[in-house]
């Protein structure tokens, strides 16, 4: 799975739990878990709200990373197989 390969990649860096990449990675895992949960439980509105909050946090971290280091941002997007936001793509 993506998680194991990315964690082994991140373990090479000693500051993995606080780095932007690791935070985005953990938010992405939470988003995927919540998405599969919501496919079964469509009326779970609290989980929907939690998903929206996590999506916003991940989006803010990704926009921060794209402003600070565009190369690391592109690598992270490709590794996690997530789409680039339209807002971020217009910034650069």
Swiss-Prot record:
It holds the Pfam family Ribosomal_S15. One of its GO terms (molecular function) is structural constituent of ribosome. It comes from the Eukaryota. CDD domains: Ribosomal_S15p_S13e. SMART domains: Ribosomal_S15. PROSITE patterns: RIBOSOMAL_S15 (PS00362). Keywords: Chloroplast, Plastid, Ribonucleoprotein, Ribosomal protein. It is found in: Plastid, Chloroplast. Coiled coil: none annotated. The keyword Lipid biosynthesis does not apply. InterPro entries: Ribosomal_uS15 (IPR000589), Ribosomal_uS15_bac-type (IPR005290), uS15_NS1_RNA-bd_sf (IPR009068). Part of the 30S ribosomal subunit. This is Small ribosomal subunit protein uS15c.
